[in-house]
Amino acid sequence: MSSWHTLAHVVVDPLPADWRDQLAKRLGQRPRRMGPWAELALYGARLCLDAAQEPALAAGAQLRVASLSGPLSAARTITGQARTGLVMPFAFMQSQPSQMLAALSQHLAWQGDARFTLSRDKQAVLQLAQQECGAAGLLIGWVEEDQRTEWWRMVLD
């Protein structure tokens, strides 16, 4: 029977004041067309892969992101814009978790099975991801906008 091995575990809490600058330096440029929640997801995911000494997420690995609230500030922005009748496309796109997954895929040089889950139960999210996962493993993160990001890179032995 296979067992799980953690290659890296990264927790950023509290967030450093310059985390966006650190991300831009790591990527070689500022991420474009991403909201703060997606940027925070990318920041944590990139730190985790760096800690695992992986330049890109392995082909066949699964990507999972979970949160209690998702991109809350973007949702608030579009709610305010909807009241005026002028919802801006960029703000709307930032409120969509699928756009965060697309940005992670692009910046991690990866294609594959990616999912976002709203949940209060980290253990249940992890167990489900592990049950669905193959030999290439899993990159799983918990992202709370303007608060913290926590990521694990795990593989089967």
What are the roles of these predicted feature ranges?
Residues 1-157:
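Conserved "HGTGT" condensation-loop signature of ketosynthase/thiolase-family condensing enzymes
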